[in-house]
Amino acid sequence: MELLIHRLSAIFLTLAINALYLTSSQNITEEFYQSTCSAVSRGYFSALRTGWYTSVITIELSNIKETKCNGTDTKVKLIKQELDKYKNAVTELQLLMQNTPAANNRARREAPQYMNYTINTTKNLNVSISKKRKRRFLGFLLGVGSAIASGIAVSKVLHLEGEVNKIKNALLSTNKAVVSLSNGVSVLTSKVLDLKNYINNQLLPIVNQQSCRISNIETVIEFQQKNSRLLEINREFSVNAGVTTPLSTYMLTNSELLSLINDMPITNDQKKLMSSNVQIVRQQSYSIMSIIKEEVLAYVVQLPIYGVIDTPCWKLHTSPLCTTNIKEGSNICLTRTDRGWYCDNAGSVSFFPQADTCKVQSNRVFCDTMNSLTLPSEVSLCNTDIFNSKYDCKIMTSKTDISSSVITSLGAIVSCYGKTKCTASNKNRGIIKTFSNGCDYVSNKGVDTVSVGNTLYYVNKLEGKNLYVKGEPIINYYDPLVFPSDEFDASISQVNEKINQSLAFIRRSDELLHNVNTGKSTTNIMITTIIIVIIVVLLSLIAIGLLLYCKAKNTPVTLSKDQLSGINNIAFSK
């Protein structure tokens, strides 16, 4: 009957959540900016974890010694088997406790302790874990090391002498009590008596006094149900190295969780938020194995405190923006890298670059501030004016025009380039739109799927308003010859600076080339002048020579007086 009630409660809760989801999703709006190939989904509200709340859960155990269940009856065998499971679980938890980081009170960092603990635990429990699983194990432990620091601190204190008895004494007459631990921290503690009461008051009298003669199977079933919580807790702690997340219903039942939320020192709005989103709360909570002592299993439950709620949040979706008017293989691309969740927080903006770490329930965004960056409010200017002077917007560049699609809250961004075929389809009408080369956007109204090449994307079916903001793609403003490629973590100003450096280099090269050409021209002129001078000199010399020659040839012969006399004239001497 109790199981049926839980199932009906879960069904009604699911229906209520779906109704709330459909109602609130209608307030979502989405703006697509053609100039930057990006879209912003608005209408969400924050639930940001800013702290942790720790509580100690104790499960009281029974000291079961040797039993007299040696019969051959099926019910007797089942009872004996379940009792053996119970004792084995307690033994494994004791082994587990000896190797937990909290058992070592020396001042060491939690993460290395967890690694030692993981190795020791796998040896002691003879658990066969592959190398791949060990790597995943250690990665998980390193990742949660800082998140569970407060829970580890409480868990360590429980190992000090007298701490468990202090808790037991505080819980003698009540199921809940605030206990001040030795480190000065006060924690809410609670006890679970179901299993111990059933074993001591109902099961053991049958086992020890009636030699396990059980008249009906209901006794067996009831013990199995009561025992299942301890067995599952043991399994979870053993498999997950003493730290589990999310918080299962075995670690903390729904009624226990709601009761604990109600006791937390937070506002009524925060309590209402957590109570109506228990699944999200479980996903962001931890349970930490502490100690098994004095017939008490104690472990720490660490719940999130959402210190920032109801502030506006928005999600930025981005896709590659490339040129399309250049021959294939010569395009340039630009992509905004500031995609993720943004939430207003005390005058600034909390930015969550890993959007998957945030959980969305209806129009509520649950994020952990440990995964956030704090940015000035001017960061929102990048959506409307990426070249603004107040905030340097983040981008990446490349020369590879890859086609892809990004599913948004109310539609899809489609980056279609080259010879890739990109379409939007309706399940009843088939293809209803074929995208041309470039970046485009399609609303989810009447669209069920988007196809890019051989990849099929299913669009979200939320309701809301879409706005298509047209604009010249900013990639067209850049010269492919000087556009820097493969800048994976850059900004608009850095890219522009590199472009200016490239342009300056080109200008300098042109100047050098001009100077070289000018020098060559001067040399040529000088050589030509020298040649001309030489030719003129040679021609002048030749002219002078010819003139002298001609003058010498035209001069008349003059005879002396003796030559004109007859005596000396040879002609007359004969």
Swiss-Prot record:
InterPro entries for the chain: Fusion_F0_Paramyxovir
Which segment of the chain is annotated as a signal peptide? 1-25
Ranges in the Cytoplasmic compartment?
A: 551-574
Q: Where is this site: Cleavage?
A: R109, E110, R136, F137
- The answer to whether the entry has keyword Transmembrane helix is yes
Q: Which UniProt keywords apply?
A: Cleavage on pair of basic residues, Coiled coil, Disulfide bond, Fusion of virus membrane with host cell membrane, Fusion of virus membrane with host membrane, Glycoprotein, Host cell membrane, Host Golgi apparatus, Host membrane, Host-virus interaction, Lipoprotein, Membrane, Palmitate, Signal, Syncytium formation induced by viral infection, Transmembrane, Transmembrane helix, Viral attachment to host cell, Viral attachment to host entry receptor, Viral envelope protein, Viral penetration into host cytoplasm, Virion, Virus entry into host cell
| Protein name listed in UniProt | Fusion glycoprotein F0
Which species expresses this protein natively? Answer: Human respiratory syncytial virus B (strain B1)
